Amino acid sequence: KHTDILSHHAIAAGRYAPQKGFDMLISAWAIVARKHPEWQLSIYGEGDLKDQLQKQIDELGLKDKCMLCHTVANIADKYCMSSIFVLSSRYEGFGLVLAEAMAYGVPCVSFACPHGPSDIIRNSEDGLLVEKENVEELADRICYLIDNESVRCEMGKKARENVERFMPENV
């Protein structure tokens, strides 16, 4: 199984906690939504910040553009319905969600945390790394993938290939 790279859908996943930076992602999505109103973002997870994040979504007028969704048993189905995965963490370890998304051919846009994302994503080859906590650049890189379907497709293919290096038989 692999992604529907042509869908107008981006996803993120993780706990609704400060570390995950979903507040920054929602702010970035406000910029994306102005340029690409046909695109939607779904953030899968649970946690203490859900009400605060929903309030931010409402205040930014993103009610129909950005959805907070419950954690699902099979996130693979959600990867397959999306064209872009976004990791907005302030800090991150290995970032298993990145490797999972890449395994389904979903190109990723991520903050360049010192560990994890910078070790997984090969910038401009199988995904895009963004200066840590730079909301405007995050929005810009998401828009770049939206605007460049062929780049998105190629990065998705490379993501599937490059993530193989993390498979148990190759570690």
Spans of model-derived segments:
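A charged, aromatic-enriched C-terminal amphipathic alpha-helix characteristic of glycosyltransferases
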Residues: 150-171
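Short hydrophobic beta-strand element within catalytic cores of glycosyltransferases
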Residues: 107-111
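Short glycine/serine-rich donor-binding loops of glycosyltransferases
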Residues: 95-98, 117-120
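Aromatic "clamp/platform" in nucleotide-sugar-dependent glycosyltransferases that forms part
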Residues: 71, 90
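Donor-sugar nucleotide-binding helix/loop cap in glycosyltransferases
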Residues: 101
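A conserved mid-protein helix/loop that constitutes part of the nucleotide-sugar donor-binding site
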Residues: 8, 12-31, 43, 48-54, ...
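A short alpha->beta transition loop at the rim of the catalytic pocket in nucleotide-sugar-dependent
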Residues: 76, 83, 105
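Conserved acidic donor-binding segment of nucleotide-sugar-dependent glycosyltransferases
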Residues: 122-124, 128-135, 144-149, 164
